[in-house]
Amino acid sequence: MSSGHKTQPQPSAGPGDRVFTKAEPLRPPAATYTISARSKHPDAPVFGYLRNQYGNVRLAEIDSLFGFVERSELYGGRAFRQRELSDRDVEQLNNAGIGVRLPLSNHFVERSEYEKNLPFLQKYHRPGNSVIVTNDDLARWVRQDFPFYRIDASVIKNIKTHKKIDEALELYDSVVMPMHINEDLDFLEKIEAKDKITLFANAGCALTCPSKLCYISFSRFNKVGQGEIQCSRSMKDRYVMGMVDFPLQVFIDLGFHRFK
């Protein structure tokens, strides 16, 4: 601006002249997901892992990650080989409002084992984190001593009747349904507590497995870190479908919003 000229003050813009609008709260997502940290190396940054493996899922849609932290004989569902989520991962996830789900789905839990794992459970005991449980005694002990954990009934419990769902929800906060239930829309529609149900977004070999021997063998393996891992594939014929992605909008329209 050159010298010698006086400028007149401009009237301030009124609300109607502004190009921005008042910020509104973000709408909650139509669906949220609990995501597997399987095969994640503990040294890999967790948000880099999410970007590379689940880049199509917005962070606002991620409820939690489930995976191994330090070793525990309470683990089940698959064999513990090494840690997947580091302490830094857990801290960063929790700071971002994303929970950590500990897969404590071992079939066999003694009281002495539970007491041995009290420091482990205390370490991750904070609102937003959860435990995945198969053994009802373990669920009761955790409920009594660690009220901040959400307790999820594992898919391994194979809860597949409306009566069993209602009974499970007397102890558990939510129930993970077997994969094949996704194909029975009439059954799903009749579930009353849909907000406490987790359905599978995709499915692998367990969808058509006739016996699921592996889960018991994983429970035994994780007690000592060794042993035979069994699979029924060589014992019983099955139709192998590979990885199956379910059409989630069908389930959302029925009133389900939590997916794994």
What is the predicted role of each segment?
Residues 2, 9-12, 18:
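Intrinsically disordered, low-complexity segments enriched in serine/proline and basic residues
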Residues 7-9, 13, 23-26:
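Selective for proline/serine-rich intrinsically disordered segments
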Residues 17-164, 171-260:
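Active-site pocket-lining/capping segments in soluble small-molecule metabolic enzymes
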